[in-house]
Amino acid sequence: ENYILYLDDKKVLVTHGDLLCTDDIDYQKFRKFIRNKITLKIFNLLNNKIKTKIASFLRGKSKKLTSQKPDDIMDVNNNTVNEFFDKFDTNIIIHGHTHRKNIHNTKYMGKNFFRYVLGDWHNSPSYIVYKNNKIELLDI
């Protein structure tokens, strides 16, 4: 889920990013259901062929629903992002999920905060490199 990484003097939160998208209420409900312990136990009892069919169905359904949602719902909620900065006591977050590759530099409570968003693996694959005390977001 969430992982704290220390890069020299930098404390970095690495997260999937879906928990930052709190305006997408339908997705958050789905996420809660699909990650429920009971749901996971039942799913793990199924054979691989059935699991693959379910995953394929859900992927297709998700793609269709995503295409029908407004862009602002599909992006992070800035208040939630600020809550994560506070909760994890960091000023750097690296995440995916939204697939909107970018480096966001914002001010919050008088300090600079950075959010590195990785791109979609199919359309704009990217990765993070840390060298010379700098974090870089690069294209593959």
Where are these regions (language model features)?
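Conserved catalytic scaffold of divalent metal-dependent phosphoesterases
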Residues: E1-F88
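Conserved beta-sheet core of the metallophosphoesterase superfamily
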Residues: K11-L13, D18, D23-F30, D75-L138
